[in-house]
Amino acid sequence: MTSKLKIDFVSDISCPWCAIGLSALEQALDKLQGEVAAELQFQPFELNPQMPPGGQDIGEHLTQKYGSTPAQQAQIRQTIAQRGADVGFAFNPNGRGRIYNTFDAHRLLHWAALEDAGKQHALKKALLVACHREGQDMASHEVLVRAAQA
């Protein structure tokens, strides 16, 4: 008998650990296929709701928010890249240059959920790739439209 499970995944597109967490969750659910039928719904969480238009240099942002040094940031990027590789999510090897406001991306994800949970899941994955692999501006409506069309 298959058990039904509803999962609310609360995350921000700009968070690399959220990309890793989603990939790890997908792997775990794949292993439970036939035993667990999971309904995955994405809930918004803005890490940086006050992020200005045009975003901010990622190194500057991490130093201001967490007090980290460039050396610490390089180490954590390496850790993130390795953990991502472990769960099948490839990050841009050069990291990201900027961090952007994700409010409109969350609005788009909400709309996608109203259409279909599968569409929301596909959009979430496309947005994570656009942000973490391609370094796209997550506040750009053009970027969001391309992700929605993918």
Residue ranges and their predicted role:
Residues L22-C131:
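Structural alpha/beta surface segment adjacent to cysteine/selenocysteine redox centers
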Residues T63, A148-Q149:
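Residue-level preference for well-ordered alpha-helical positions
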Residues L128-A139, A148:
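Acyltransferase
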